[in-house]
Amino acid sequence: MTLLLIALLSISQTTPLSAEDLFDAARRGDHARVAELIDAGVDVNARGRYEATALMFAADRGDLEIVRLLVERGADVNLADTFYKFTALGMALSNSHLNVAKYLLQHGAKGATMALNTGIREGDEELVKLALASPDLDATSLHAALARAKRGSNAAITDLIGAAAAARPLTAAPVVTVPAEVMQSYAGTYRNETAGVTITIAIVESALTLTVAGQQPVQLAPRSQAEFVAPELPNFMVAFSGRGGTIENMTVNQGGTSMTFARETAPTSSNAAGSTAKKAAPAPAEAAPTRQKGAPWPAFRGANASGVGDGQGAVAEWDVATGRNIRWKTPIPGIAVSSPIVWGDRVFVTTAVGNEADKTFRTGLYGDVKPVDDLTTHTWRVYAVDRRTGAIAWQRDVFTGQPKVKRHPKSSQANSTPVTNGTHVVAVFGSIGTLACFDVDGKPLWQRDIGVIDNGWFFDPTYQWGHSSSPVIYKSSVIVQVDQYKGSYLAAFDLATGKPLWRAERKDEISTWGTPTLLSGPRGDELVTNGTKVRAYDPNTGKEIWTLGPNSEITVGTPIAGKDVVYVTGGYPPVRPVYAVKAGASGDISLAKGETRSDSIAWSNDREGTYIPTPLLYRDILYTLNSNGILTAYNSATGERLYRARVGGGGAFAASPIAADGRLYFANEDGDVFVVKAGSEYVELGKYPMNEVIMATPAISDGVILIRTLGHLYAVGEPAAGNRSKTQ
């Protein structure tokens, strides 16, 4: 007893105890610490961000020992978070931690339907038996599970569920007959553009089926002439609607949540997502644009992230296979998704060269939150490449050692794009907390430790993803945005010396990945940042000017400045907004419920924001590109939608779009670059495979498009006088 009292006093006298301490111990699997904290008075059911509990974190990790300890100490097994609506059982099942799921079911956890379906999928008889024994399982879900089991090959599980279903027959429903011609009118494809999901309705053996891409068809049964249910899926209903005898929409309701899908008519192009899309033979979008003096591309997506390279002689066609319009190709070692920048005859790129045996990188559309467990020794490096020849002009190693944070499988240890003003080159490497400055000839000028930047999942920060916000130069300072689970801030450093100039704390901000943008207006310059709240600061002092919410919980895109307006998007729940904010605002400019504009906001919507790629403002049109290739064009002044299309027919896109001479350039993760005509309708001009993964945003300067793949840096452009294509 005395030893226990001493231990408790020792804990209480060091730092105040909190739910966060308990969450951290549960995530780390520290059994002793969890017990100590509960003994010291921390509530075992303490709720954190989005009402998450320690039990949820332990279940998510599959730590049966911690789960058992928490339940024995009184943890409520049926508490759910308010964001994902998951209980501890849901966390365990979604990660296939079946032993944890079984334990939770044995201790009264609800969620038998999900457990039963998981047991069928995993072929786990014990899990199936526990789910069948749960009073939480209703007859409708039971019979739907039986239909699913019959499609499988596990006879023992099918027999178990069949016996349970026989004992609980469904109440007979009235037979509804839908004429064949009516069912035929429902057949076709339907799409929800915001979610990027397409559903196909077909007639198979006189019955309607519903298919989501990549999944098995589900048979539908009529409940009325226009409403159908899926016997295999509990609480699932589909309703068709339209006007004048034409079916226009399909609404899917599952568990009380509805989503509307628009009927897709036969488009004029297989790439279209709307009737405005067209396809043209490869050709320049404009005739002989005036070639201007070579302009720099000094930062992420060029000057102030505008992404515009007019007058720089960007070509509209090339061929990697034959070498046509490929000036050079230079290998860049390591894994990095940072983008190239250009000043004069120098192209600057960063990389992190790690364990050659671990090249883990996963492209595509997926939602996996688990990081790559590679904390082996890396070398963080800055390269200067000759823009004319592709030769390495110089390379400088910033640091060699182990990264302090993990990375997402679609990320790297060198995500942030460097910045230059023609004399200084500044790079930030978040996973080692280093801000480094060189002159353009590679001479080290200064290096500053800004602290490891630990970006990750807002729900559980131990799922680390890596920092990607890029530095920006403003006058004689370099500014960095450091948003993480705790301790977020915005800071300016003297460009010549690295000396700190100001720091603005962002105490209520969590991990974000966008880069700050400068907006010039009648009241002076504003530094606009994306995040769970959009904020503007005085770039001279760091003083906050205005705030705007709500926004997505994960924000990646960079704000884009136009004339006296800045455009900001977010593409993740709880809202997916597009905001057009006027320069000169002040204070809290959040809109009242139901409003879409105000004195400070030119226009907005809360449903069509995009996730990873940064929007593009070009010739009075705002283009937003979602990660699934959905391109939406808006009148930038009014927000009126001009068209919506699927670039290249869809796919995964991480690189941001750029524009030049009346053309738009889009690079997907598979390594295809699509050239599209700029304007109020979608016209695809060509597709140009690079045959390597592309995550970085291309750059345009002085006759070349610089395209970085995971393995190489390419210069795409008409051959320079006297030069031939070169491969290093």
Please describe what each predicted stretch is.
Residues 2-12:
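Bacterial N-terminal signal peptides
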Residues 15-50, 54, 127, 131:
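N-terminal segments that cap or nucleate solenoid repeat domains
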Residues 24-29, 57-63, 91-97, 118-124, ...:
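Ankyrin repeat A-helix N-terminal signature
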Residues 272-728:
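Noncatalytic, solvent-exposed loop/strand surfaces
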